[in-house]
Amino acid sequence: FLFHSVPYTELLKNDSLESDEYNKLGTDASLGCVRLAVSDAKWIYDNCPVGTYVKIYDSDETEPLGKPVPMRVADLKIGWDPTDNEKDNPYNGKTPEIKLPESTSVHLGDDYNIYRGVTATDSCGNDITDKIEAIGNVISSRRGEYKITYRVTDALNRSAEQSLIIWVE
């Protein structure tokens, strides 16, 4: 078969995913097949009849549809594909997490970076701090209260949002 999910160590056992192989999604990891996350394999199964024409795009140029960012599993012992919608999947219900700094005050006139001390992890525990978007600003030359809202979305399209009040004193 051209398309298939990442291998499992046991037949019909959703918690037996070869997690190290899952983390190779998006790389040259097999002998010519296209390995997929469960959700992608299921979409093809549900939407593409047998005999559907497949065009393989292999080039150093920008791809016409873009290349999806694969999710990685941080804990290789869990053994589940994070995109599997089975009810027992421990990734179900997990969302990204944003951690904010404890200090929320700035001295008048000090430089302030609204991203300092702000971190984020995805639904699988991977660092996605570089994907954080901030809404708002701090004008450190003017006393007052400033609200910054941080948002992040992971490769599973799950989101988190946290707000922080910064005092310029």
Model-identified regions with their sequence ranges:
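A structural connector/turn signal
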Residues: 31, 43, 101, 135-136
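Solvent-exposed, low-complexity, repeat-rich "mucin-like" stalks and linkers
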Residues: 92-126
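Serine/threonine-rich, repeat-prone extracellular segments and beta-strand-based repeat modules
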Residues: 126-155, 159-168
